[in-house]
Curated annotation (Swiss-Prot):
This is Histidine--tRNA ligase. Homodimer. Pfam families: HGTP_anticodon (PF03129), tRNA-synt_His (PF13393). Its EC number is 6.1.1.21. It is an enzyme of class 6 (ligase).
Length: 424
């Protein structure tokens, strides 16, 4: 017997029972995006490798250790996208969407990183990202955060996420802070773990992200990034905080929040939760005013974020049990008798025409009434429409409310109207 081929470790199948809840959550997210005037952009999952090296940074963990990179048949180095911002910027430059224009874009789809798989962290994972181009004030930063807060309210998880904010300033301010931080770390090198020693010279701000308790204790005495901010970044951050306070959005300033990708400047933020164990970041982003120019476009202010959908689904399921998947089927059409199947299928097509958006399944494979009603129950139907030989002859159908058990004989021409009343 041939050996079964299984999914690659860290790349998961999502089965019908799971995709139903994903679809409802995604529908909620998309409705909110539409209410803010954001437009979808669809991007390739494979890009040229230099795009990510230039955008993310050569000495980041993502580029050094996590990218799925391969050579194609033409000898070109290609990479499965590890994040969405770089590809969105590339598309904006390539298609002339950015220069002297405002764009509010969103995308959704799989990303790929070669990490150690664990709950909430996978090698193929899904993100929804938003990117805004052409606006440089703190007001658009605030709008993005307000948009995410509206998502949490719609999903019933507001009480389980908290907002952390920071400003990492301009490139020049960050360079000055980098020098001060390296000088401090060199004085305490013996207290650093091997990972932090490596990062100290390649990407020292990432030491602030260390999960090592001893390093965290050491960092209490480290120089504060806020003390090195340029005046323009201070004013920008103060403006953002004031707007969030006016909107009633609570936040905590976390001066160790730096983000893991090199392209960020000024505003950075994360929505975090205590309900998912170690994988606490649900949504994160910030401003990246230099990235468009860095990738070959003209200087364009930009800000955005990405949200991990696997973690969001886990969080919704953990803290909001009332958030259920929509039923697969609203109506199940039961047909019994030698000559009823063609009539049942014709009625089903007519009902689909008249009841837009209603999910109707016709019984196939025969079976007595008991078996067919069991199938209706399995698919979550609220109503059964029953056709037997006598109903076909009389031009009627029996409509049965599967919750109350009440049933009514209705002329076939009136079935759609009766169903509208039952389904609300």
């Amino acid at each position: 017997m041939a050996k079964n081929i299984q999914a690659i470790r860290g790349m998961n199948d999502y089965l019908p029972g799971e995709t139903a809840i994903w679809q409802r959550i995604e529908g909620t997210l998309k409705n909110v995006l539409g209410s803010y005037g954001y437009s979808e952009i669809r991007l390739p999952i494979v890009e040229q490798t230099p795009l990510f090296k230039r955008a993310i940074g050569e000495v980041t963990d993502v580029v050094e250790k996590e990218m799925y990179t391969f050579e194609d048949l033409n000898g070109d180095s290609l990479t499965l996208r590890p994040e969405g911002t770089a590809g969105c910027v590339r598309a904006g430059i390539e298609h002339g969407l950015l220069y002297n224009q405002e764009q509010r874009l969103w995308y959704i789809g799989p990303m790929f990183r070669h990490e150690r798989p664990q709950k909430g962290r996978y090698r193929q994972f899904h993100q929804l990202g938003c990117e805004v181009f052409g606006l440089q004030g703190p007001d658009i930063d605030a709008e993005l955060i307000m948009l995410t807060a509206r998502w949490w309210r719609a999903l019933g998880i507001s009480e389980h996420v908290t907002l952390e904010l920071n400003s990492i300033g301009s490139l020049e301010a960050r360079a000055n802070y980098r020098d001060a931080l390296v000088a401090f770390l060199e004085q305490h090198k013996e207290k650093l773990d091997e990972d932090c020693k490596r990062r100290m010279y390649t990407n020292p701000l990432r030491v602030l992200d260390s999960k090592n308790p001893e390093v965290q204790a050491l960092l209490n005495d480290a120089p504060a990034l806020g003390d090195y901010l340029d005046e323009e970044s201070r004013e920008h951050f103060a403006g953002l905080c004031k707007l969030l306070e006016s909107a009633g959005i609570a936040y905590t300033v976390n001066q160790r929040l730096v983000r893991g990708l090199d392209y960020y400047n000024r505003t950075v933020f994360e929505w975090v939760t205590n309900s998912l164990g170690s994988q606490g970041t649900v949504c994160a982003g910030g401003r990246y005013d230099g990235l468009v120019e860095q990738l070959g476009g003209r200087a364009t202010p930009a800000v955005g974020f990405a949200m991990g959908l696997e973690r969001l689904v886990l969080l919704v399921q953990a803290v909001n049990p009332e958030f259920k998947a929509d039923p697969i089927v609203d109506i199940y059409l039961v047909a019994s008798g030698a000559d009823t199947q063609s009539a049942a299928m014709a009625l089903a097509e007519r009902l689909r025409d008249e009841l837009q958006g209603v999910k109707l399944m016709t019984n196939h494979g025969g079976g007595n009434f008991k078996k067919q009603f069991a199938r209706a129950d399995k698919w979550g139907a609220r109503v059964a429409v029953v056709l037997g030989e006598s109903e076909v002859t009389n031009g009627t159908a029996v409509v049965k409310d599967l919750r109350s058990g009440e049933q009514t004989a209705v002329a076939q021409d009136s079935v759609a109207a009766h169903l509208r009343t039952l389904l609300g």
